[in-house]
Amino acid sequence: MRLCAGLFLSAAALAAHAAALNINFSDAAGKPLLDAVALLEPATGKALVKPMADVEVSQAKRQFAPRVTLITVGTKVTFPNFDTVRHHVYSFSPIKTFELKLYAGVPNAPVTFDKPGVAVLGCNIHDTMAAWIVVTDTPWFARSAANGRARIEGVPAGNYRLRLWHAGLGPGIEPAPVAITVGAADVEHSARLAVSTEP
């Protein structure tokens, strides 16, 4: 009984000391940047991650939604088609190569993303359709909203590497990681990326 109580108290103590990292993303012109990704990795070692449940990247009005999806390694993703036309979804990215040939409705099986990295999605029928799936092996991550803000919650105290990504940076390009120290209080960080959002 004492052991159980001790374990409970230890877990509660960890939760009490967890903080949040708030990132304010902006583009090259200083405007809020949508769909920027922040990945917080331990400075040493690896953190335990579990696959996420019920992740969908849909097709509607000949567009992918969402355009950027952030998942953990091992997550299965379904690709429902809500359009009245058929789509041919594919990725030729090294972390995951697959094709869902001409289909309507929901494919028979989801696609499992079992390696970290970025998978670029396209449609073999509609060339203007594009989306990105960012696969991470850390449990601390976030994607920025339209106001450029992203928030990673529940981060234990310690030293970390902050990795940043945005599709507008180009394939395989990401800024150098930033060293971040998390304590008991929330941490604020601003990131200006060399991305142009002008039409």
Q: Would you name each region that the model predicts?
A:
Residues 13-16:
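N-terminal signal peptide c-region/cleavage motif recognized by signal peptidases
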Residues 1-8:
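Bacterial N-terminal signal peptides that target proteins for export
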Residues 18-199:
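Extracytoplasmic copper-binding redox domains, predominantly the cupredoxin/blue-copper superfamily
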